[in-house]
């Protein structure tokens, strides 16, 4: 059994998500201690618990310590099987963080896996669902992974109630990813949404983002989406499609924050990611790590983050030395797979 120290590096939920996903894929039992030790409210949160329970279902696993607040978890997987997954986080817990745990494992099932998750679609400290469906999935397609993520209903903090449905196909053909420098930006796209709010909120977010991005001198199309849910909220995701991959930026609205500031923030984040000229933004970088171990390849990221370094550490705890990292945290960098699994 592999023991993982949950307080390593940035000591967040990602250690847990990647560990249980890798355990499911490899069939290797794992014990995780000091779960989220560096966080103000340590231990398992509802979104972590539901990700674990979904992976337990997929892997027919035996699990100990699976409850909110738990600081230690034992996960003993049996056989990975394709099953339908239905999760209600019960709070505005992040749907995309649950998916970050599920996606690497689901693609190793022998048949298509469908999922339906209820919770937060656009919440702080996690990628918005539009980022996952338009940036992450676009990159995964390049390595041979096919799937879909659809927003049925938005969910914001504190009420949640968002619904996301989708599926992934089995990863039958693993293709190497070589994503170094882009040579041109083809277009900018985006989605600006307002839920239980006037339509002008989404329109103003979109307009402000577009004004900021005009300097790139490429076609820009940011569509607005107005919807109803159980609570109000707004946000915007913008992405640049290059001749390599897509890079993204996003921002969330909140009470008292002008829509123009929200739009400008998302655009500025995208501009920051594009600046180094590397194909992979800092958010996608850490998301790709578990997949790259199996596909092989090389990625140049706009910024090496603690998240990325921590994810590499977890993957290598299971699989041995896989990656060579050139660069320091907080700076652009290069990640090369020196041994694919």
From Swiss-Prot:
Gene3D superfamilies: RNA 3'-terminal phosphate cyclase domain (3.65.10.20), RNA 3'-terminal phosphate cyclase, insert domain (3.30.360.20). It is found in: Cytoplasm. It is an enzyme of class 6 (ligase). Its main location: cytoplasm. Its EC number is 6.5.1.4. One of its GO terms (molecular function) is RNA-3'-phosphate cyclase activity. The active site is at residue 307. Keywords: ATP-binding, Cytoplasm, Ligase, Nucleotide-binding. It catalyses: a 3'-end 3'-phospho-ribonucleotide-RNA + ATP = a 3'-end 2',3'-cyclophospho-ribonucleotide-RNA + AMP + diphosphate. GO terms for cellular component: cytoplasm. Pfam families: RTC, RTC_insert. GO terms for biological process: RNA processing. InterPro entries: RNA3'-term_phos_cycl_insert (IPR013791), RNA3'_phos_cyclase_dom (IPR023797), RNA3'_phos_cyclase_dom_sf (IPR037136), RNA3'_term_phos_cyc (IPR000228), RNA3'_term_phos_cyc_type_1 (IPR017770), RNA3'_term_phos_cycl-like_CS (IPR020719), RNA3'P_cycl/enolpyr_Trfase_a/b (IPR013792), RPTC_insert (IPR036553). ATP binds at residues 100, 283-287. Belongs to the RNA 3'-terminal cyclase family. Type 1 subfamily. NCBIfam families: RNA_3prim_cycl (TIGR03399). Catalyzes the conversion of 3'-phosphate to a 2',3'-cyclic phosphodiester at the end of RNA. The mechanism of action of the enzyme occurs in 3 steps: (A) adenylation of the enzyme by ATP; (B) transfer of adenylate to an RNA-N3'P to produce RNA-N3'PP5'A; (C) and attack of the adjacent 2'-hydroxyl on the 3'-phosphorus in the diester linkage to produce the cyclic end product. The biological role of this enzyme is unknown but it is likely to function in some aspects of cellular RNA processing. This is RNA 3'-terminal phosphate cyclase. The gene is rtcA.
